[in-house]
Amino acid sequence: MPNPSLGLLGLCIASVLLAGCSGAKTASPVQTPGAPIKPGTQWLEKGAALLQAKPPIDALNAYLDGFHFYNGQPAIQMEAHHYCAILNEDVIQCVIYDGSTATAKIMGVEYIIDQKLFARLPDKEKALWHSHGYEVSSGQLVAPGIPAPAEHALMKRLATTYGKTWHTWHTDQDQSLPMGVPQLMMGFTADGQADPAMVEQRNRRLGIDTTQTRKQRADIDIPTPDTGADSWQKGVVIQLNDPTGTHLHKPATTTPADTNSRSAR
């Protein structure tokens, strides 16, 4: 049976976010090579913005900020900005950026489904997905800029979902262009996994207190994850081999305070 709270929540989120509340801005960690935009191109862009309808883009009315790591490389972590469209009561699709400015780079996509749909998936498919319960209960997953009651309702809904995430532009590895092949990403499932400095950098920039958020979410029921999800914890690591050698996963350094955070340990 569809969950009516998500439909109501979608209206709440849309009304708030369309008003422009999105919190502090986060810059991309890389500069894209290429010639500056010419006046003619600017006019073309402005004309397209005025004349062309963009229903799929207009549907991206929810903003989530959280963290991912490369499947098989749990120490290589980064902040991820999700701009999401609620397709129905049980399915959400998100475009993932490495920041929240107009020049942020598209890092990848995440598909989010409710536990009812996840339970129907074949076991081999489940291994590609990660649970969201800990991300919610820990306070690491946030919805910047919306009122606390709306965020709490959203997190209550997301606690029962699973995500499948692919990153295609690895700016956390200082790639100024989308090189290499897509990589499967995962989410944290327990304390001690996320780089605390990475989380703190994000928290300071967005004005978030994760400890306080965690307390406020103590009343959210977190289901036991399906045993087919988070397969990396069981030693089942699925990843695409990269013939270009791009994904050597070099240790990263910290980024400036106003820039997308990443692990550096």
Predicted region positions:
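Bacterial signal peptide processing site
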Residues: 22-24
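Bacterial N-terminal signal peptides that target proteins for export
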Residues: 1-9
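C-terminal motif of bacterial Sec signal peptides marking the signal peptidase cleavage site
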Residues: 17-20
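Eukaryotic, polar/proline-rich low-complexity intrinsically disordered regions
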Residues: 161-168, 172, 176, 191-195, ...
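N-terminal secretory signal peptides
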Residues: 33-98
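A cross-kingdom marker for long, charged
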Residues: 213-265
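Alpha-helical membrane-anchoring segments
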Residues: 54-61, 66-78, 104-105, 112-117, ...
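An exposed acidic His-Trp-rich patch
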Residues: 100-186, 191
